[in-house]
Structures are given as C-alpha cells and as structure tokens.
Amino acid sequence: YLGNHGNLLEDSRTACQLVRLERPLLSEEEFDRICAIDRVGFKPRRFRAVYRRDAGEGALQAALKQLAEDVEAAVRDGVNIVVLTDRAAAGEVPVPSLLAVGCAHNHLIRAGVRTFADIVVECGDAVSPHDFAALVGYSASGIYPYNAHACIRDLAVHGDLDVTAEQGIANYNKAATAGIVSIMSKMGISTVQSYHSAQIFEAVGFTPEFVNAYFAGTVSRVGGMGVEDVEREQNEIGRA
C-alpha cells in the first residue's frame, strides 16, 4: 500500500486513503501513474539519489545526508509517496538503491514521521529476486527496475524472445515476485506486507558505523567497508 498510514494508535479516515499495489514489481506504466497521481490525499515527489563524480571524497556521504534531509522536509510538507530514483546524468554517479532506501527509511524513523509516507524506488542496479527482496525488506513498497526492463525490450527488438516486450516484462515481474515469495517462505513469512520493512538480513563486510547509520537494527558480525569504500567502488563502476 502507498500513502499516509498516519498514527496507528489513532482512528482516522485519512489513514484509509491508500493505493493498493498488486505486487512490489512495477511496470513503466504503473510507475508513471504513481508519480503522476493527482488526487486529494496523495502527494508524490521524486528525489534523485545521485552525486557528482568530481565532488571529491565524501561526496556519497554528503549526498545521503542531503537526501535524508530533503525527504524529511518533504514528508513534513505533506508528501506521502517518496520516489527515489538513481537515474544519473553525465558526470553523476548513482547511489546504490538499497543504500538510498535504507538511508531514507532510517532517517524518517528517527524523525518520527515514517508512517506518514511510503517509498517507491526507480533503480537500475536491482535485477535479481534477492535484490528485490532486500529492497522490500528495507521498506521499498514499489520497485521499478528500469534497466532490467530495458534489457528485455532490447532482446525483444532483436528477436531473441518468443514473446513481445510487454509480455516479457510481465513474465519477468511475475517471476521476480515469485522469487521474493520463495525467499519469504524460507523465513516462515506468508505475506509481502509482513516482510516489508522487517530487515531480516545480516550485513557482512561493513563497518558498524555504516550499518548503524543506514541499516539500523541489522545484525553485523563481520566488519569491513565504510561509506568511503562504497563511494570508491561506485566511482569505479561508473567509469567502467
């Protein structure tokens, strides 16, 4: 569901004004419709999760801080559908989608306004069921994997698929959703709503400071990379 869930301890009609999603994976049409909602009770806004490659060391951390502040300010201003996008222009580097979602999610919790908005993510780095399960587990209500869909369209154009691009994307979304359900079932969870924001993961290879800042509450027994290391890795990927 998307929208303002309000205070769970108070009876309010406005908390019932929600958009119901059939599944976490969205088509381009569904994603565009969410971004363009123009009805009383709904206020979507898009936020770019990117940073300048030439901004120097600390650019990723600064971008995450700015993203968190912008999202909080927007939610306090009435935005109840937060759309995070990693589409980058020339000279920009995308923030990993899971990191962007975790950053926004944890900051809104600390600010005490998490239930007032839901998060939708437009991402190019998520392609597998595990990627999607992690995003849902860290509070993404809707996911539009534009790169994966673009690859399917390209395969269809070149005749490498036995179905149309639209059917291929529908099959992909259905299979990915089945993958999420399979992962959930191994944890004894039967509904996506119960898995949403549950954070049933263990972080391996990240410093406690990094985990506490962006994935608070996640078990982490093996340290390793910090935000500076993630930034260097993203910069290398961007140059490839």
PLM regions with names:
Residues 95-119, 171-176:
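Alpha-helix-loop-beta-strand connector modules within alpha/beta enzyme cores
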